[in-house]
Amino acid sequence: MDYLMQCHNIDIQWGNHDVVWMGAATGNWPCISNVLRMNISYNNFDMLEVGYGINLRPLASFANEVYKDDPCEYFMPHLINENKYDPVDPMLAAKMHKAIAICQFKIEGQRIKLHPEYDLKNRMLLDKIDYEKGEIEIRGKRYTLRDRNFPTIDPENPYELTSAEERLMNILEASFVNNEKLHTHIKFLYSNGGIYKKVNGNLLYHGCIPLTDEGKLKMCKLGDFVGKGKEYMDYLDKMVRKAYFNPVDKNGRDADIMWYLWLGKQSPLFGKDQMTTFERYFIEDKKTHKEHTLAYYKKIDNKEVCESILKNFGLTSEHSKILSGHVPVKIKDGESPARGEGRLYIIDGGISKAYQKQTGIAGYTFIFNSRIMALAEHKPYSQLQKDGTQKFSSPKVMIVDEMKRRLTIEDTDIGKQLRSKLENLKRLLKAYRRGYFKESNEKIRLS
């Protein structure tokens, strides 16, 4: 983020991982618990404690006390990167991981009850557990839990935080809300980002646009709002900004909308029917882990569907493209980033090492200049050697569209702005020549 803030011209289309951090910065407990759970899961202690100065000692003490005899084997962190400044014993990290995960499930259950409009009742699972038998019922089928140790859960009231958990969350909230470094980065995301962006005739967004099974724009209902396509995206953008800059609830609950965008079934940043976090931890049967993508991902192979989305955003040029990310493109399995006969490109950046084994590459960059549109395919970076050297590979560049004539500044968004300013100056000059403005004889003094 510090590097991005030094760039002279940058814009960001918020993704689900962005908004959950943005929500956490407001003090929103569902977002805070998700952010911590994910980063502990991937052993990102350097970023949390050294980078942002988030105080994890209370969580470590709590986890060590509550889960001291629990091996927490299904909560062992993924050791993709080593922590140089703040190494944490994997066993302790696993206990911290489980502790915050249980807090998350409790807090989310409370918020699901508070927001029936989110339609997330199927994600309330703690009350579906038979704690004596160590089983859970999901969609009419019973499963044995592979981890049955729940020392902080009251079977009669499973979503209630213990006094110790409540105290812990208050301390963690303070680390986010009063975090100058984090808020500097979050404000940068707001100043330079949005749910979507139209630029030079192209449409950029992170994930998807909700569609019906027929490929039409889906009417989305969220609280008092009902709308689709661009209207829905504009509404979400407004609500995300309001939750940070002008919240009604000082306890961070306005940011529940960011939590919804993280995992909601109508979230254009998530794009799936559910987030099966609980099942991945506690149930062996991988069928329960399945997260089904929304109709959008089945329909974007259709050129007409892509063009209807572009048209809804006021983009009708034959060269207009949709550029999105979110979903890793599995090149090694024969998948292609191009959809809708070249009207849409999924260009996940591939920075996350966790996905590179799935994709076989290190993501894409989309290039648009005055003559062509091109796609650059990157190879994973080699490890930095002890002598400070590092091997880099040139990307594979594929031209995907050629302009009929070379574009000029006049054809760009900046050109349109300059044209508008020129027309305004012409109208001003015309009005002056017709005597619509009175000349002032008052002298201006310069001090």
What are these regions (language model features)?
Residues 1-447:
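Feature recognizes metal-dependent phosphohydrolase scaffolds
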